[in-house]
């Protein structure tokens, strides 16, 4: 919230004090406040102090988050323009923060910069098309953006293109369909530039596995969240298993859950522990528990998984050892290089947990270790190296800015994914955001519309994929972007 407030040049004290007043008026009767309500109000009162203290600390260290850097840049723009004489080109921008608007306008007005739009005439001239929303507003509101800045708009969108809209059932099918289309396109013409724009990063592994199996070069610029690696669940399920320990016995459903995870059943059976048979026998006896004596002392892998928690050092060392065993299993059985890389990073993650435990922050309980491990896991993204000039490029929609391709494949064109749709903001509500000029879900929709339709301006072939089956929280509703294309029949 602080980041956006600064980037949009909002008066900090005004909005934070306003937020406190709004909460008091709308939500609470002071006479009926409980302990939680009182704590909430104390927090609200302290937020301006938190901002002030954070600002002073960052200033003293000459560092800052991006929004703060934007605010400082606008305040020091005069000094910058005096000391730096270079001419500036602003290329491919669309939705600007208020700070960016100030910087752009000052430099352009002084003849020290120019702006190069990446927008088709069709989107600019149609006053109702979301893709042109921001740029239309800039040209209308910035007095010096005269005709020469609008004459540069392209006219590619209306040219003839091969467009296919493909509906599939289930999320995983989208990834497989996209991968197969990309494989066929590459084999037909390897010189064409091909991109898969992935709406759900969790399916990156499926796409990479499919493309790699055909020996086709690829590059994934979006990164791969380590938490999406399927082997991670082995460790998360071990936490759940050990938390049920009562006198060396575990709840059978948790034992089932861990053995259902990839690698575990195979490794246990190969080590001489007939875990399938043991679980079946317990079920026949209508037992809800499994004593650890059935598996302990029979193999290294069995001890690593089922040994009750004793202390943090020994448990973390066990998880490091388990990571290494899984890695050897993956190498021996010729699993993908991505999976091997992921388990290596899991091992690194556990070593980081060990370092934290050996520092002043001692992790005494299993739940403490779980909290640290999952926190580190959430923030870990793998950089996947490939060839950015050959083969199939894989990225998220926002990463496609100012890039063009011969063949564009977009997945997850469903409402609630592309575009993201209406979502609650974490702290500052919609009406306060509107009052102070902060972005709402409306601006988010305009932003996604620009990136999507801009991507369709120049390719010769376009493959658009959506899930027509209700799955999880998503209804299977076709994206409004697809409906726009079908209704207006453009291009």
Residue ranges and their predicted role:
Residues 1-431:
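Nucleic acid-machinery interaction/catalytic patches
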Residues 237, 253-257, 262, 414-491:
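Accessory/regulatory regions of helicases
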């Amino acid at each position: 919230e602080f980041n956006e407030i600064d980037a949009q040049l909002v008066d900090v004290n005004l909005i934070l004090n306003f937020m406190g007043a709004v909460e008091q008026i709308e939500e609470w009767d002071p006479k009926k406040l409980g302990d939680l309500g009182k704590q909430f109000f104390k927090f609200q009162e302290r937020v301006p102090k938190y901002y002030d203290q954070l600002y002073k600390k960052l200033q003293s260290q000459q560092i800052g988050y991006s929004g703060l850097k934007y605010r400082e840049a606008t305040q020091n723009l005069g000094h910058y323009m005096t000391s730096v004489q270079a001419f500036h080109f602003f290329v491919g921008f669309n939705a600007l923060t208020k700070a960016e608007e100030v910087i752009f306008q000052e430099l352009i007005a002084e003849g020290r910069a120019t702006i190069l739009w990446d927008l088709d005439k069709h989107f600019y001239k149609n006053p109702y098309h979301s893709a042109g929303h921001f740029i239309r507003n800039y040209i209308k509101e910035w007095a010096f953006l005269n005709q020469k800045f609008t004459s540069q708009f392209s006219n590619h969108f209306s040219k003839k293109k091969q467009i296919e809209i493909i509906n599939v059932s289930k999320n995983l099918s989208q990834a497989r369909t996209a991968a197969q289309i990309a494989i066929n396109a590459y084999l037909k013409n390897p010189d064409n530039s091909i991109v898969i724009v992935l709406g759900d990063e969790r399916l990156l592994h499926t796409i990479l596995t499919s493309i790699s199996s055909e020996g086709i070069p690829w590059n994934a610029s979006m990164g791969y969240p380590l938490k999406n690696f399927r082997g991670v669940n082995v460790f998360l399920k071990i936490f759940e298993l050990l938390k049920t320990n009562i006198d060396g016995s575990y709840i059978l459903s948790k034992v089932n859950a861990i053995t259902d995870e990839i690698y575990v059943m195979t490794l246990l059976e190969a080590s001489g522990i007939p875990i399938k048979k043991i679980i079946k026998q317990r079920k026949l006896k209508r037992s809800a528990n499994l004593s650890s004596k059935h598996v302990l002392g029979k193999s290294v892998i069995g001890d690593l998984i089922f040994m009750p928690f004793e202390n943090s050092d020994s448990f973390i060392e066990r998880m490091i050892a388990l990571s290494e065993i899984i890695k050897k299993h993956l190498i021996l059985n010729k699993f993908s290089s991505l999976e091997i890389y992921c388990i290596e990073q899991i091992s690194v993650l556990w070593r980081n947990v060990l370092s934290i435990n050996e520092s002043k922050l001692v992790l005494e309980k299993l739940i403490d270790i779980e909290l640290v491990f999952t926190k580190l896991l959430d923030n870990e993204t793998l950089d996947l190296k490939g060839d950015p000039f050959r083969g199939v490029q894989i990225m998220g929609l926002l990463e496609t800015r100012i890039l063009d391709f011969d063949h564009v494949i977009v997945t997850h064109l469903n409402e609630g994914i592309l575009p993201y749709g209406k979502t609650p903001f974490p702290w500052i509500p919609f009406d306060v955001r509107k009052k102070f000029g902060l972005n709402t879900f409306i601006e988010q929709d305009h932003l996604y519309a620009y990136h999507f339709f801009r991507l369709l301006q120049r390719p010769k072939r376009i493959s658009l994929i959506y899930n027509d089956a209700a799955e999880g929280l998503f209804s299977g509703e076709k994206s409004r972007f697809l409906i726009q294309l079908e209704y207006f029949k453009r291009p």
